[in-house]
Amino acid sequence: MINNELKDIFSSNDFNSKTWINNLLSDCGGSGSSSGNAKSNQQSILTDQNNIKAELEIENICSNYLSKLQLYQIELNISLESITSESLLIVPKSIREVDRIRKESLHLKNRIKSISSKIGEMNNDSPQSMETVSVIEKLDQVKSRMEISIRSLKEAEKLLSFSKTVDQLFSSNDYLMISDKLEEVKQSLSVLSDVPEFREQSKKFNVYQDRLESQLKQPLQQSLQQKDLESCKNYLKIFTNIQRQDKFFIYYYQVRIDPLKLLWNSYSSSSSSSSSSSNFHNWLSKFYDEVLVMINSEFNWLSGLCPIDYIQVLENLIIHLFTTINPNVQSRIDQAITIANQTTQQPIKVNELLSIYKTTCSFLKSLSPIFPNIINSSSTPTTSPAVDKLFKVIFEPYKYFQNKFSEYEIKSVKSQLQSISPILTLQKKSGGGSGGSGNADFTNIIKNIENQFIPKSFQIAQQSIERFFDFTHTTDIDSYVNTVLNQIFTEISLILRDTINELKFITGLTTNYIIGSSGTFPNFNQQQQQINTPSSINGEVDPVKKLTNSHTRSHSRSGSGSGNSNSNSVGTSATLQNWEYFQGAMNLLQSIHQLLNKFQQFDNSTSLNIIHYLGNSNNSNNSSSNNDNDQFICNIRKFLLGKDLNKIQKLQISVQNLENIISSPLPLSSSSSVSKDQSISKKPLLLQESFNQISKLLSISQHFVYETLIYFIKLKLKELPKIVSNEWNNNNNNNNNPSQNNGGGGGGGLSYISQITDHLLTIPQQLDPYSEEELTRFSLSTSLQYPIKTCSNSEDDFYQNLLIQYQREKQFDDEQLLIEKLKEKQEQQQEQQEKEQQQEKEQQDADQDININTNNNNENDENDEDDELEDGIAHQWITIVAKATEKLYLQTIVEIITLNEPSCQQLSNDIGYLFNVLSALGVSAEPLLQKTQSLLEMNRDTFTSFYHQQLHNNNNNNNNNNGNSNNNNNNTNNISLLTNAEKNICNLIGKMRNIK
């Protein structure tokens, strides 16, 4: 064990014998002096024995080391002696060589001097030197000509020999030897090209080459078919020798693509037995698989045939294949994507076209392991022309469809939209519908718009964008945006317009239809005859006859009866509003608002997605996993754009417009509905035309809500002239004191105005569920910017004038409120300044805090002002309906033919009652209607005097206008304060009251 330990110690690389011996001796000395007791003596004895053994081992090892060292020393001495002796022998030889080289350099130097001196002598202009040079030059020319002649004679001899043995040579079938001989003949002909006698041989040489090629054709094709690599190598060498290497590869391409050509041509017979639309797509995928099998096989085989440029040969093989089949590709794709028995109105199968195209892209990507430049960022037209040819030959048939993509896509999308539009049409029933079927259809259509049509429409639009990315790679943004995207939302708007016309037809509330998708106003001839029937609509009860108990209200004016004389009034035909139609119209308005909001998000996301798509595919430094795919798309885009500067410039302009749209700052939002709409319209949009169409649809939806609210009032006011002429005037003529009798005509008047006011007072209850729904807010700016166009121009003008008047009044009220707020602010600021001046300078820090709080309060005050300027949703609608009611009331009064005095008082009381209700609703009275009331409440004598004064004033004005009077009438009567409209009302009332 000790021996093993010692071996380990001495065999280590860092063993130091001197240090180890000293350490061992020191340990032995220390252990001998430390024995004190019996136990320690025993241990020391054992230790001594071990030390003795160790010392013996050390002596043996040391002796061995010493002997080895002595031997090494002897060997080293011997080697040093031998090396030294050899070095001593070499030194004299080296000295002699150095001396020899020195002598040679001196001799060479002397020779150079001698030559330079001779050259100098020859450069002298002596006649002797010039003659010598001339003789030498002539001799050199003679020598060169003799050499050329000798070479020409040898080449001529070769040609003569070849001509004699050419037939025998070709009959030997040693094609390699023939090619070598032809190569020699070619060289000989190049030498003898200036000899006229051998020019005819040059023509024969081409014949010899053709003869050799014709003999090689059949065996070459057999060898290529059998993939005999050695034979093909020999044939390639032969064709290379005769400068016809291209012909060799042409034969190679023909042999390799013939089976694939047969497979390609076999599709016509297979397709005739199958009419499946996906037949060509599936077959093309299998065809590409066969091509890939061939390419992988040839990749390995060609590396043995031509190791240097086999990749280029393989690329040319693929190019030849697709060049051969391309004339039929476009027609087969067109046949595959065309619907059977297609007319010009039917769309093509765009999804099928995209599937075929994606299959081709996948095929080209699968070639990237062999041709890395297909997806390599370094692939450029200058570095890889073969790859560019590969892209061109494979994608060339699709270029036609990519240029027509927008045309195909819009037809397909319109077809998809039309396929989902039946959910918005009236459900036809075989047997007459019940009284509630109209309501059911109305409600279902509204729900389908929100829950199905709008989401599906955006899904269709998003899928169209994805197809645009996948098929055209954004090479023609402008055409797609204008031809497809804008047309999609235009079609959506037209479908919804048709739906609103359907809803109007269902409700029967109006016949003022809007222009539909056909570009004309709809004509519901047969249906309209049923609508005009007072008792039914499509076999259903008139909508205003449908009673809703929860909406029933009872109103009476002070001093009037209970309204028990309604049997002869307009209330006999219709007494209550059907609020289900109003609720549906409000839900429709919400849906259209949601459509507009979604559209704005869609427009923004579309711009971002296009820029993102272009950025990814153009960024060659992208390190994501999709880098290869992005570069592949970029290469396809380069091929599609090519060198067409118009397309490139058009794409650059489109991208610049998109970047401007994205980078444009969002307008500051405001709490005001009007300002919100204006800010939205100022934001540049990609699909501005679509935004206008949807905004127009929003304006139409708001008008539809207005129609559901105003219809009942129109219906009640429509019968007022008949009530006045048939009931009021007759009853009051038979009654000496009509003002105290509320049972006859007065009861009729009470019934109509009471129902109108009941309707107006019910509107806030119906609007209450929508008071917090911003999507039901009336957008005044939208309605003014996008006026409606129905089949009734008078109704359109009435509605637009109503909105303009409402806008003016609202602006005036807002300005007055702002003025009051500014005054309050100024007073508060003055008070604040006075307080700040009174504060001590030591409280400067506190003053700063106060100022900060003051600024925050000012900002909050501004927001509060905006909130105060904004009308509530319910108040908006109530105000519009109330203003319309007043205007309709005026129009109805104008239609009255005659009025007796009690009827005037009755009508004045009705107007006053309406004003009281409007005041309770927070709506100001119409000034012209107020003046009408004041004229009606005058007794006959007072009005007669007033009327005559008005006529007299008009005559004076006419005289002044004709220059017959020098001074204006100084009459300061109230009549001078009448406006033209009020004068017209006064004249009409005078005619009604038969004032002469």
From Swiss-Prot:
Location relative to the cell: Golgi apparatus membrane
Keywords: Golgi apparatus, Membrane, Protein transport, Transport
Annotated stretches, region: Disordered: 533-571, 828-867, 950-974
Start-end of Basic and acidic residues biased regions: 828-844
Membrane protein topology class: Peripheral membrane protein
Subunit structure and binding partners: Component of the conserved oligomeric Golgi complex which is composed of eight different subunits and is required for normal Golgi morphology and localization.
Biological process (GO), any one: retrograde vesicle-mediated transport, Golgi to endoplasmic reticulum
Gene that encodes the chain: cog7
Organism taxonomic ancestry: Eukaryota, Amoebozoa, Evosea, Eumycetozoa, Dictyostelia
Family (UniProt): Belongs to the COG7 family.
Official protein name in the record: Conserved oligomeric Golgi complex subunit 7
Organism: Dictyostelium discoideum
UniProt KW Secreted keyword: no
Function: Required for normal Golgi function.
Entry GO CC: Golgi membrane; Golgi transport complex
Classification via Pfam families: COG7
Comp. bias intervals (Low complexity): 557-571, 849-858, 953-974
Primary localization: Golgi
Domain of life, source organism: Eukaryota
Family annotation (InterPro entries): COG7 (IPR019335)
